């Protein structure tokens, strides 16, 4: 496999131009395309060697952690919604990073099986993402109209429906991340 690193680097720089666009525009642009050939494979290596944060498994690469830290500092979300709690390590890590950056927020982390511990500023919610009912299961969106929101889709289930549903509640300045740890 011959990887063109200069192409990957240039593609990454160009990708910043369309950073703040609607989900529909992003879907149209990326339909059946790999925008940055080779890069996802290169930077995802090591994700499953399990970095730990405190005693919790953290399914993130060092690169992910740097990007998230920068994003959290820039966006400063008042509410973080995470679909796919896993072990809960990601939510704990984000809560600690936000505190270290000097701002308060609350994290709502949803999974079909919620982690079995409590942590300041995090609410773990047992939730089957196949039964999207925003009004019943995600009341925080109704009450978050004047707050900056960061949504992270990392559940890998019913992704299209989740994105379409969540998109109705997002506004300019909010952020949506789709990841696959």
Task: Please place each PLM-identified region on the residue numbering.
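A short alpha-helical cap/connector motif
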Residues: 1-151, 155-181
């Amino acid at each position: 496999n011959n990887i063109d690193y200069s192409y990957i680097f240039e593609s990454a720089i160009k990708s910043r131009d369309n950073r703040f666009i609607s989900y529909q525009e992003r879907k149209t642009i990326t339909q059946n395309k790999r925008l940055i050939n080779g890069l996802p494979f290169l930077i995802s290596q090591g994700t499953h060697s399990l970095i730990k944060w405190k005693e919790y498994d953290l399914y993130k690469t060092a690169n992910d952690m740097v990007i998230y830290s920068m994003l959290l500092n820039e966006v400063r979300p008042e509410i973080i919604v995470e679909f796919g709690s896993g072990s809960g390590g990601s939510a704990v890590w984000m809560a600690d990073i936000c505190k270290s950056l000097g701002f308060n927020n609350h994290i709502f982390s949803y999974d079909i099986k919620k982690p079995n511990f409590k942590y300041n500023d995090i609410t773990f919610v047992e939730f089957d993402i196949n039964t999207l009912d925003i009004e019943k299961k995600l009341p925080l969106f109704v009450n978050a109209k004047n707050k900056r929101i960061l949504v992270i889709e990392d559940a890998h289930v019913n992704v299209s429906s989740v994105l379409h549903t969540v998109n109705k509640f997002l506004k300019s300045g909010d952020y949506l991340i789709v990841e696959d740890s």
